[in-house]
């Protein structure tokens, strides 16, 4: 096992298995849900007009593609992610672009990027999964040119994001062995603590650190909710392989738990996040 495989081994296995395939299957729904954050990242890039941008944890490539369209042929956009299924879809989507970005299947925590090769590093919910965040952001800073900007969006706490944990809470009585989330482990809410995020960036050498709360209403067509619940999140993975009737019962219970978020033909919820910016001096 090489150094890159040793680091983040659990996350690499997760995102190259059920989690990664689930995001591939739900790509269109997820892109719609997360579109407001993609716009934020694109706005940040537009304000700086960089020549080269790295999108960390790019997933199926939506944000990287949007940045690439903005920059057109005069600049370069690169997406990196540990998930082979998601990178494969990102590359397939890129083939349809006039000025396609480049996608790398690698762990941004350890990958040997060309030093000082990017003058902006961005991420839409892709930086909370490192098993050594200081090491990861040091590695990203090595890839950043002098004066390069960092612009990432991360989730705040689970308590502030009830939509994101409703499925787990509703499914828990049926799935007693479903692992509980821990706030200090790699995962969706790993950067909920503002002070921890600040300390990670400071220790990894970034400067001019700014962390601000961001609350955004997100929407999903009601018709897509059941598919979304079946493909995304810990509960979706926990119910895989269950007896068909039991599986249907769990999904029915979980779906009913989302009724408070249903408004007509839409599902709406407020996403509580941090916008994080910094600079490589």
Regions found by a protein language model. Name each.
Residues 2-4, 14, 19, 26, ...:
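Conserved Class I S-adenosyl-L-methionine
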Residues 32-51, 66:
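Conserved alpha-helix/loop element of class I SAM-dependent methyltransferases that forms part
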Residues 52-111, 135:
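Class I SAM-dependent methyltransferase SAM/SAH-binding core
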Residues 71, 94, 171, 258, ...:
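Conserved hydrophobic residues forming the short capping helix/wall of the S-adenosyl-L-methionine
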Residues 109-120:
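A short acidic, Gly/Pro-enriched loop at the edge of an enzyme's catalytic core
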Residues 119-133, 156:
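A short SAM/SAH-binding and catalytic strip from SAM-dependent methyltransferases
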Residues 134-135, 141-142, 146-220, 236:
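Conserved catalytic/acceptor-binding region of the Class I
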């Amino acid at each position: 096992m090489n150094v890159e495989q040793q680091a983040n081994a659990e996350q690499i296995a997760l995102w190259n298995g059920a989690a990664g395939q689930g995001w591939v299957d739900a790509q269109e729904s997820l892109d719609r849900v997360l579109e407001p954050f993609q716009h934020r990242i694109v706005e940040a890039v537009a304000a700086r007009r960089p020549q080269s941008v790295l999108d960390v944890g790019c997933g199926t490539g939506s944000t990287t593609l949007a940045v690439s369209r903005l920059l057109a042929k005069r600049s370069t956009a690169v997406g990196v992610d540990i998930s082979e299924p998601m990178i494969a879809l990102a590359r397939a989507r890129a083939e349809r672009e006039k000025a396609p970005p480049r996608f790398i299947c690698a762990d941004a925590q350890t990958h040997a990027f060309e030093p000082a090769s990017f003058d902006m590093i961005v991420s839409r919910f892709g930086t909370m999964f490192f098993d050594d965040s200081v090491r990861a952001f040091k590695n990203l800073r090595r890839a950043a040119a002098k004066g390069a900007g960092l612009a990432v969006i991360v989730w705040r706490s689970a308590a502030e994001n009830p939509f994101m944990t409703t499925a787990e809470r509703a499914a828990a009585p049926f799935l007693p062995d479903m692992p509980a989330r821990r706030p200090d482990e790699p995962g969706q809410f790993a950067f909920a603590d503002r002070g921890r995020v600040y300390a990670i960036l400071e220790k990894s050498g970034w400067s001019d650190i700014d962390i601000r709360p961001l609350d955004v209403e997100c929407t999903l067509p009601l018709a897509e909710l059941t598919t979304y619940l079946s493909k995304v999140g810990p509960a979706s993975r926990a119910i895989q392989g269950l007896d068909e009737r039991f599986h249907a019962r769990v999904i029915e219970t979980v779906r009913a738990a989302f009724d408070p978020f249903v408004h007509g033909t839409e599902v709406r919820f407020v996403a509580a996040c941090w916008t994080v910016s910094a600079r490589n001096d």
